[in-house]
Design a protein with these regions (language model features):
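Glycine-rich phosphate-binding/catalytic subdomain of phosphoryl-transfer
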Residues: 77-178
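N-terminal glycine/serine-rich phosphate-binding loop of ATP-dependent small-molecule kinases
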Residues: 1-116
Length: 178
């Protein structure tokens, strides 16, 4: 808040109790980060969860269960930080923002069932597809883009490919368990 050019700080504990805060969650490739921002745009608390993709069937992946567990862990560590700093537990937020990796491949059917393990940005098996798409569009298509993964699945006649109704990356999915 500003009053006649002077900066007036808001009490963090009161802001948290009044839900005058913003919660941010970011799903990065090696860490899930959580941050609580106050009305003065100051960081009030943070939390996080380290994770690492793993080889599954020759491809780098995370499971959706790992996504949910990582979110829960990052959020729990944020809440613990809030409690330790301010002796209050947040129960509501003024706003929530979620950011996730924009690269990789999640393939869902018409009923929103995951058809193949998530393929992370780290996979480089999409060279042929990326080259073909780059030539077709006259625009560089990186190996890690979802469209390169989808086209590679078509080129490889992967079992799941005919049932893909919605290909996306983590940024297009969000961690909403069924």
């Amino acid at each position: 808040m500003k009053t006649q050019g002077a900066h007036v700080s808001t009490d963090p504990r009161a802001a948290i109790a009044a839900a005058d805060t913003a919660l941010g969650i970011e799903f990065g490739s090696t860490r899930i980060k959580a941050v609580l921002i106050g009305p003065d745009h100051e960081v009030l608390a943070t939390g996080g969860h380290g994770w690492e993709n793993h080889l599954e069937g020759g491809l780098w992946s995370y499971t959706l269960d790992e996504v949910v567990a990582g979110l829960q862990s990052a959020y729990a560590s944020l809440v613990a930080d809030v409690r330790e700093r301010y002796d209050v537990t947040p129960v509501s937020y003024g706003s929530i923002g979620i950011s996730a990796m924009m690269h990789g491949y999640l393939a869902f059917d018409a009923d929103d069932n995951l058809l193949a393990p998530f393929r992370t940005w780290r996979n480089t098996n999409t060279g042929r597809a990326a080259d073909e798409l780059t030539r077709l569009f006259g625009f560089n298509i990186p190996l890690r883009w979802s469209i390169a993964h989808l086209h590679q699945a078509v080129l490889d006649s992967e079992e799941h490919e005919p049932r893909v109704a919605r290909p996306t990356a983590p940024a297009g999915r969000g961690p909403h368990p069924a």
